[in-house]
UniProtKB/Swiss-Prot annotation:
Pathway: Amino-acid biosynthesis; L-histidine biosynthesis; L-histidine from 5-phospho-alpha-D-ribose 1-diphosphate: step 7/9. InterPro entries: Aminotransferase_I/II_large (IPR004839), HisP_aminotrans (IPR005861), PyrdxlP-dep_Trfase (IPR015424), PyrdxlP-dep_Trfase_major (IPR015421), PyrdxlP-dep_Trfase_small (IPR015422). Its EC number is 2.6.1.9. Its cofactor is pyridoxal 5'-phosphate. It catalyses: L-histidinol phosphate + 2-oxoglutarate = 3-(imidazol-4-yl)-2-oxopropyl phosphate + L-glutamate. GO terms for biological process: L-histidine biosynthetic process. It is an enzyme of class 2 (transferase). The gene is hisC. CDD domains: AAT_like (cd00609). The modification N6-(pyridoxal phosphate)lysine is found at K227. The lineage of its organism: Archaea, Methanobacteriati, Methanobacteriota, Stenosarchaea group, Methanomicrobia. It comes from Methanosarcina acetivorans (strain ATCC 35395 / DSM 2834 / JCM 12185 / C2A). This is Histidinol-phosphate aminotransferase. GO terms for molecular function: histidinol-phosphate transaminase activity; pyridoxal phosphate binding. Keywords: Amino-acid biosynthesis, Aminotransferase, Histidine biosynthesis, Pyridoxal phosphate, Transferase. Belongs to the class-II pyridoxal-phosphate-dependent aminotransferase family. Histidinol-phosphate aminotransferase subfamily.
Length: 367
């Protein structure tokens, strides 16, 4: 009898997946440079510097004793509150754990077959290609314009009979720019594929594209509680989908994927409009401060981060210099086709923003 080797148990597609590269953690930087952890400023993962809503924290404390009980299988309680927040009926909403990534996993699970294609404009959030590849799909990359805008004609030109999903990000990560409504309409109206718009950062922006889900049955929008709501550690996301897709998604969705703690914290966070508005205003004011004061070219942003071009310096060297000073930022060389001179900087508190500006000023002469 012949036995498979352990690697032979794994699907071939898995070996084609490049490992996802997250931002550096406080623990990593503290260990690498001998810095006291409380003094480190983490501006590399686009987290909310104000933390979660006090109401969400209170909900976690009150819910924890009941953590031995399963939550509702479909997160109905959260979806009802999201219905009021988004203006969409519950029948258009799905909740997902872990975060929006879980939504992407679920959609690829029900849509992508071996040999299917997904379109990914680059540079953008790296995760889109991972679940597609894991399901046997092939990512087709379309380069963005030099200003990181999309060319709808290029996107549509990449569509083939095997195209199943087109992934778009607005505001885009790592560039922070919005997708114009006219461009989205053109893409959606001229493809058979599902168009997925990632709006993880949309609360920080001047407008959103979610309303178009009412008009098109091949358009879906994903959102998260990790950014403006400050619940990144709970891994909670949701999708606004056409009703036909909600039905099929629910067939294969992981039961109880949203934990009881995440569910209750999400409901509480949605009720705290004061914390929501403070978080939005902090990001909007801070990104303008960073754009005006960082001594390198800074792209306009509609998110809670800015993209810095440190040319002629290299992003890795400048980022390492900042990290030695206890400031974590994100060099963008791990983003496909982003080059080696871009750094993404999360908007922090005013004090943190001042420190990062000073660190960039010093790095400009040190690197």
């Amino acid at each position: 009898m012949m036995f498979l080797s352990r690697p032979e148990l794994i699907k071939k597609e898995i070996f084609e997946i490049a490992e996802y590269v997250p931002g550096k953690s406080i623990e990593e930087i503290a260990a690498a440079y001998g810095i006291d952890p409380p003094s480190i400023i983490k501006l590399g993962s686009n987290e909310n510097p104000l933390g979660p809503s006090p109401k969400a924290v209170r909900a976690l404390v009150e819910t924890a004793p009941g953590a031995n009980i399963y939550p509702s299988a479909d997160a109905r309680e959260l979806r009802e509150v999201l219905s009021k927040y988004t203006g969409f009926p519950v029948s258009n909403i799905v909740a997902s754990g872990p975060g929006m990534d879980g939504l992407l996993d679920g959609l690829c699970r029900i849509i992508i077959e071996k040999g299917d294609e997904v379109i990914v404009p680059t540079p953008t959030f790296a995760y889109y290609e991972l679940p597609a590849r894991a399901c046997g799909g092939k990512p087709v990359f379309v380069r963005r314009n030099p200003d990181f805008s999309l060319d709808p004609e290029k996107i549509l030109g990449a569509v083939s009979p095997r195209t199943k999903i087109i992934f778009l990000c607005s505001p885009n990560n790592p560039s922070g720019n919005l997708l114009p409504e006219a461009d989205l309409r053109k893409i959606v109206e001229n493809t058979h594929a599902l168009v997925f718009v990632d709006e993880a950062y949309v609360e920080f922006a001047d407008r959103n594209l979610t309303g178009l889900v009412r008009e098109y049955d091949n358009l879906a929008v994903g959102r998260t509680f990790s950014k403006v709501f400050g619940l990144a550690g709970l891994r909670l996301g949701y999708g606004i989908l056409p009703e036909w897709l909600v039905k099929e998604y629910s067939r294969a969705a992981t039961p109880f994927s949203v934990s009881l703690l995440a569910l209750r914290a999400g409901v509480a966070a949605l009720s705290d409009t004061d914390h929501l508005n403070k978080s939005i205003n902090l990001a909007r004011e801070g990104r303008e401060y960073l754009k005006k004061n960082i001594p390198f070219a800074v792209y306009p942003s509609q998110a809670n981060f800015v993209l810095v071009d440190v040319t002629p310096l290299k992003a890795k060297k400048v980022s390492e210099n900042l990290m030695k000073k206890g400031i974590i930022v994100r060099p963008c060389d791990s983003f496909r086709e982003a080059g080696d001179s871009l750094i993404r900087v999360t908007v922090g508190t005013p004090e943190q923003n001042e420190k990062v500006v000073r660190a960039f000023e010093i790095s400009k002469t040190e690197v």
